[in-house]
Each structure stands twice: as structure tokens, then as C-alpha cells.
Amino acid sequence: MSVTIGELIGNFILVTGSVIVLLLLIKAFAWGAIEAVLQARSQQISQDIDQAEQARLNAQQLEKEGQANLEASRSEASQIVEAAKETGKAQETRIVAEATEEADRLKAVALTDIEHSKSEAISAVKTEMSDLTVLLAEKIMGANLDKAAQSQLIDRYLDDLGEA
């Protein structure tokens, strides 16, 4: 099997011609469809890239909004805690003031009661003393005193007691 140069050149020309005819047929009938498919694929890839970029930008925006919401929530929580502390302090101050006021009121009532009891006791002692003084004076003098003399004697005796 020996191949000559003429056969090789003939085969080369035949194959080259077939390829050229095939390329011309492809260009005439299929190249538009192939180019359209490639163009559609290129557009689809470009759209996918644009959508991915838009999704990335949206995600960044949502992240920023989430951070802002988180900071706002933290700030609001801090304000709520601070308001609760202030309310607690105000209630503490109010309760202490009310307790102090109630203690002062009870102290004043107790002092009034003490003064009243003291006055009653002094009055009772004065009455008892005046009765005893009159009785003693009657026994010493041996006679009953009239009301004016009795009153004068009691007043003098009480004045002497007050000075002592």
C-alpha cells in the first residue's frame, strides 16, 4: 500500500473542499441559529450576573437595616431599663417620704396623747391634793372652810408647789 503524492494532494484538496463546503452550508443554514443560541446564553449569563449583584446589594442593604434595627432595639432597651431605674428611685423616694410623714404623724399623735395624759394626771393630782389639803386644813383648824377660803388656800398651796 503505497500512497503517491498525487493521491495525497488529491485527498487534501477533496477534504479541504468538503470542509469549506461544510462551513458554507453551516454558515448559510445553521450559523444564525448557533449565533442566536450563543447570544441568548450570553444574555442569560449577563442577567444572572446582574441579578447576583443586585441580590448582593440587597443583602448588604438588609444587613445595614438589620444593624440599625438592632442598635435601635438596644437603645430602646437601654432607655426602658433607665426609665425603670428612675421610676424605682422615684417610688423609693415617695415611699420613704410617706413613711417619714406617717412616722412624724404618729409621733405627733403620741406626743399629743402624752400631753393630754400628763394634763389629766396633773389635774387629777391637783384635785386629789386640794381635797387632801382641805381635809387636812379642816382637821388642823377644826372647822369647815367656806368655798372662798378653801379656793384661796388651794391656790396658795399650788403656787407654793409650782415654785418648788
Curated annotation (Swiss-Prot):
The keyword Metal-binding does not apply. Its main location: membrane. One of its GO terms (molecular function) is proton-transporting ATPase activity, rotational mechanism. Keywords: ATP synthesis, Cell membrane, CF(0), Hydrogen ion transport, Ion transport, Membrane, Transmembrane, Transmembrane helix, Transport. It is a single-pass membrane protein. The keyword Transmembrane applies. Pfam families: ATP-synt_B. The chain crosses the membrane at residues 12-32. It comes from the Bacteria. It is found in: Cell membrane. GO terms for cellular component: plasma membrane; proton-transporting ATP synthase complex. F(1)F(0) ATP synthase produces ATP from ADP in the presence of a proton or sodium gradient. F-type ATPases consist of two structural domains, F(1) containing the extramembraneous catalytic core and F(0) containing the membrane proton channel, linked together by a central stalk and a peripheral stalk. During catalysis, ATP synthesis in the catalytic domain of F(1) is coupled via a rotary mechanism of the central stalk subunits to proton translocation. F-type ATPases have 2 components, F(1) - the catalytic core - and F(0) - the membrane proton channel. F(1) has five subunits: alpha(3), beta(3), gamma(1), delta(1), epsilon(1). F(0) has three main subunits: a(1), b(2) and c(10-14). The alpha and beta chains form an alternating ring which encloses part of the gamma chain. F(1) is attached to F(0) by a central stalk formed by the gamma and epsilon chains, while a peripheral stalk is formed by the delta and b chains. Belongs to the ATPase B chain family. This is ATP synthase subunit b. It comes from Streptococcus equi subsp. zooepidemicus (strain MGCS10565).
